From Swiss-Prot:
Residues 1-48 are annotated as: Disordered. Belongs to the methyltransferase superfamily. METTL16/RlmF family. GO terms for molecular function: 23S rRNA (adenine(1618)-N(6))-methyltransferase activity. It comes from Shewanella baltica (strain OS223). This is Ribosomal RNA large subunit methyltransferase F. It catalyses: adenosine(1618) in 23S rRNA + S-adenosyl-L-methionine = N(6)-methyladenosine(1618) in 23S rRNA + S-adenosyl-L-homocysteine + H(+). The keyword Methyltransferase applies. It holds the Pfam family Methyltransf_10. GO terms for cellular component: cytoplasm. The keyword Transferase applies. Specifically methylates the adenine in position 1618 of 23S rRNA. It is found in: Cytoplasm. One of its GO terms (biological process) is rRNA base methylation. CDD domains: AdoMet_MTases (cd02440).
Length: 365
């Protein structure tokens, strides 16, 4: 994607909302599966991948829930939205978009040093604990246990950064990564540019690129001779605006039922999202198919390609597509946040030996 005159930011799609204040995660034992051979050069077969089931990542700052007194101290405006629950804990109304946006602003300020963060009305408001979990797991994926690896030197591409720019913000603040963030929406990128300009800690760390082709993923964004250690993406998973609206209503109704409200209440929600953030032709499955197909064009320019996969049934066609491309290594990381389960699908065209050489050349301490 060509850079717009003004640094642009991409539209990331964040589609989950967390109701529980104290996020309690159960660690599930991993399923017994035949492990993949490290560095195997055999084509990937269509078989279940080893899935790592865990609670929030051990390095996740939100592992023990939200410390509302500390968050209010850092961001006093949050106090307006905090109420005691019937169980004696503090919480907010997670169906109130303004409350959720204010909580995000408080979390970003208290934990990540971001003093100014805002999104346009109707834009996707991401759950911070789940988003930073993705960042932590791909950081481990990149290092592969190599203690000589300085992952802070990594260059990362965020596909569809959205108006919130959450992955570049978290990745740059937690690990010091350099980001290219792309999006098909100039409006979204303009908002991310505004966030960058208001936060000195982000300046010089995030480059924004507008994707001129709404049917492309990497084409038009990755430049010749450019190198990335990681790509990140939270793809739109609905196939139409009508489907996205139905999904939103379902989530709102579930929240209202859980808190004892009438399901006929007006559907105010934190499951916002502009069109490009929520749906695309063919939905998540088609988006992932395009991403996998295009990744082959940049096989030697990127060490690890990764994406969130919201729908379990979309994994099998992804495995089949990767097998056809003779991808060297495929990994699936299952993440759980409350009742929400999502997966990180990761693949590399490089063998284990080549990945080690890549780290030695580009990420050595």
């Amino acid at each position: 994607m060509s850079k717009p005159a003004v640094k642009s930011v991409q539209s990331a799609t964040a589609k989950t909302a967390t109701r529980a204040v104290n996020i309690r995660q159960k660690v599930k034992a991993p399923k017994q599966a035949k492990p993949e051979g490290k560095g195997s050069t055999k084509p990937v077969k269509d078989r279940p991948r080893v899935e790592i089931k865990k609670a929030l990542h051990p390095r996740n700052a939100h592992l023990n829930g939200y410390d509302f007194p500390a968050l209010i101290s850092a961001f006093p405006r949050l106090k307006t939205f905090v109420r005691p629950t019937p169980y004696g804990a503090l919480s907010i109304d997670f169906a109130d978009p303004l409350a959720v946006k204010t909580l995000n602003a408080a979390l970003l300020k208290h934990h990540y040093g971001i003093g100014a963060w805002d999104i346009p009305q109707g834009a996707l408001c991401p759950p911070i604990p789940g988003r930073v979990d993705y960042v932590h797991y791909v950081a481990d994926l990149l290092a592969e246990g190599d203690k000589s690896c300085a992952i802070s030197k990594a260059r990362v591409l965020d596909i569809g950064t959205g108006a919130n720019g959450i992955y570049p913000i978290l990745g740059s603040q937690v690990y010091g990564w350099q980001f290219v963030a792309s999006d098909i929406s100039a409006h979204s990128l303009t908002n991310v540019q505004s966030i960058i300009e208001q936060n000195p800690a982000l300046q010089g760390r995030i480059s924004l690129r507008l994707q001129p082709d709404d049917k492309a993923v990497f084409k038009g964004i990755v430049q010749p001779e450019e190198r990335f250690e990681l790509t990140l993406c939270n793809p739109p998973f609905h196939a139409s605006m009508a489907e996205a609206s139905e999904g939103t209503k379902r989530k709102v109704n579930n929240l209202q039922l859980n808190r004892g409200s009438s399901v006929k209440a007006a559907p105010k929600l934190n499951f916002g999202g502009q069109a490009a953030e929520l749906w695309c032709q063919g939905g998540e499955r088609q988006f992932l198919a395009t991403m996998i197909r295009e990744s082959q064009m940049f096989a030697d320019q990127c060490l690890w390609f990764t994406s969130l996969v919201s729908k379990q049934e979309n994994l099998k066609p992804c495995y089949q597509a990767l097998a056809q491309l003779k991808v060297d290594t495929v990994k699936t990381i299952e993440m759980q946040q409350g009742n929400k389960i999502t997966r990180v699908l990761a693949w590399s065209f490089q063998s284990a030996a080549k990945r080690k050489l890549w780290r030695a050349e580009h990420l050595a301490r």
